[in-house]
UniProtKB/Swiss-Prot annotation:
This is Small ribosomal subunit protein uS8. One of its GO terms (cellular component) is ribosome. It comes from Xanthomonas axonopodis pv. citri (strain 306). Signal peptide: none annotated. Belongs to the universal ribosomal protein uS8 family.
Length: 132
């Protein structure tokens, strides 16, 4: 069965696992999911990520969630651009999440990066999601 929005699936799985206190999340892997998870790891929202081969020879992404004093580090995880309505922003129009306390993950011509990195690189792109 094909998935219409794999990025939304990734975000919902992370949000649901954090809500019930799970340590890890396993889901089918893709290049964009790994890139988004790598940004989350670089920004300190998750502990680790691993790509492994499942028994059916499909790549599987395992994300190790991060908690602080028993509460998940990720409080808000929201999809912005979606398959039915893509949201593109220029370098001067990139959003700031919670006045700079959160991040927006942007898909640019130079790869997937945070809003701050995109501003620094002077590029705009598709605003994938917000994390706080």
């Amino acid at each position: 069965m094909s998935m219409t929005d794999p990025i939304a699936d990734l975000l919902v799985r992370i949000k649901n696992a954090a809500a019930v206190g799970k340590q890890t999340v396993k889901l089918p892997s893709s290049k964009i999911k790994v890139a988004i998870a790598q940004v989350l790891k670089d920004e300190g929202y998750i502990t680790d990520l691993r790509v492994t081969q499942a028994e059916n020879n499909k790549a599987e992404l395992e994300i190790v969630l991060k908690y602080f004093e028993g509460r998940p580090v990720i409080e808000t995880l929201k999809r912005f651009s979606r398959s039915g309505l893509r949201q593109y922003r220029g370098k001067t129009e990139l959003p700031k999440v919670l006045g700079g306390l959160g991040i927006a993950i942007i898909s640019t011509s130079k790869g997937i990066m945070t809003d701050a990195q995109a501003r620094e690189a002077g590029v705009g792109g598709e605003v994938l999601c917000f994390v706080a």
